[in-house]
Amino acid sequence: LTVKTVATTGSLKDAAGNAMTSFDIGTNLAAQSGKTIVVETTRPTVLNITSTKNNGTYGVGEDINVRVTFSEAVTLSGAGAKISVPLETGDNDATVEINSVSNSATADGIYTVLEGHTTDGSDLTAKSKPTLVGTLKDHPAGNEIVDAGLDIPGGQNLADTKNIKIDAVYPTITNVTSTTADGTYKIGDDINLTLSFSEELTLANGTLDVTLNHGNTDNAKQSINAFTDKSSITGTYTVAVNDTSNNLDHTSIALGGSGTLKDGGGNQPQSWAPTNQTLGQNKNIKIDGNRPKVLKIRSSKPAGFYKVGDVIPIQIYFTEAVSTTAANILKATLETGSTNTDAVVTFGAIDNSGIATQDYTVRTNDLNPALTVNSIAVSGGQRVNDQAGNEMTDKSIPTGKNLADEIVDIYVDGVLPVDDGTAITMTTKGGNVVADKYN
C-alpha cells in the first residue's frame, strides 16, 4: 500500500502558528520496513470447466478428471464443504464432488462412468454451474466467491474445452432377419443373414458366429468376419447336403476365436439374444438339403409265373415326391436272363409324385425266377428333382429293397417249349387210344 498524495482543504499550522506549505511525502508507507500492505477486493470467479483426460469415448468404469479453473488461487473451508459439478450423462446424471481445495486456482474431482451413462454422441458437459457448500475464498485476501462467481463463462464449459464422449450403455443385438424371400431353398442356395445392433459396433480379432437350426452340425455355424463401426451386418448361409429346417432360425449367437464386439466406449453386449425378434420370427424360410433317393422297388403283381406277353408294372418308390425335367428320361434295367439283352423300362414324365410306375411286358426268351432291377439311370443330361429342386444324384437301390426282396418269386419265363426231335414211346394203360394225339 502506497500513499499517493497528501493535501488539505484548509490550513495546517504548528503550535507557533506556522502554516505547512509542503505536502511532499518523505518516506512513503510502502518504503517502511515491515509495512507491505496489499489491498485486494476482487472476488474470485470460475474461468472454465475442463479435464486432464485425453479426448475420446469412454465406457463403464472409466475414471475421468473434471477440473474447475478459478480466476485466482482459492481455499475451500467449512463443515462438509464441497464443490459439486453436475454432468449431463443421460437419464441418470452424474455429479462430481470436490472436497478439498487449498490455495490453488484449480479444483479437481473424478467422475467414474457408470452403466447407463451416455452423452448420446455429444461431448461431456456440465449440466449447470457448480454449487458450493461451505466457503471458497481467495488467498491471501480472503475475498469470498459469491453465487454469480460460479457461473461458467460462455464457451468455457467442459464440452467447449474438451471432446470427451460417454458411452456406458451396453449394446444389444436388436434383430435377426434376412433379405431373402420366404420360401423353400435347396442345396447350394444362398440365404442372407442380417443382424442389427442398438448402435455402431466393431468386431475385431475373431468372428461373430450364428448357429442355425437346420440339424447339420457340419454346416450349422455361419461366421461373420471382422467389421468396423456397423449398426448392422450381413452374412451368407449356403444350404448344404443334409441341412433341413421347416422354419430357419438361429439357436445361438457368439464370438468365435479371440473376437471382441464393442461399441465406441468399449462396451460389449451382455446378452446375445435379440431384443426384438429372431430370424424364425421375422421370416418363413424352409431348408431342404436332402436329395431324393430310391426307397424301394415293387410291383402291383403278386408272386407267380409270368409268360410272354404278360404285363408286370414296375414301381420305383422315392424317399420324397419328385419331378422329372423331361419325359422318358428315367430308366430301369431289369435282369431278364442271359439269352436276351436286359429289358429297359422307360418311365414317362413324373410330376410331384413319390412313385413312378411303368409296365414291363415279358418278351420271348426273357427268363428270371426272381425278377429284379439291375440299375436305375437318368438319360439325356436331364434330372430327377425333389420339390425344392434338389437333384437325385444317387440312383442306387438300397440293399434288401429290390423287387426280388419286396415281392419274392415273380418268375418270368418267356422261353417257349420246342420239339427237339426226340422219339417218344408211349404205352397204353387202358381206355381208348386216339390216333395222332397224346393219350
Regions from the PLM with identified roles:
Residues L1-N439:
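Non-catalytic beta-sheet/beta-sandwich ligand-binding modules that flank or precede catalytic cores
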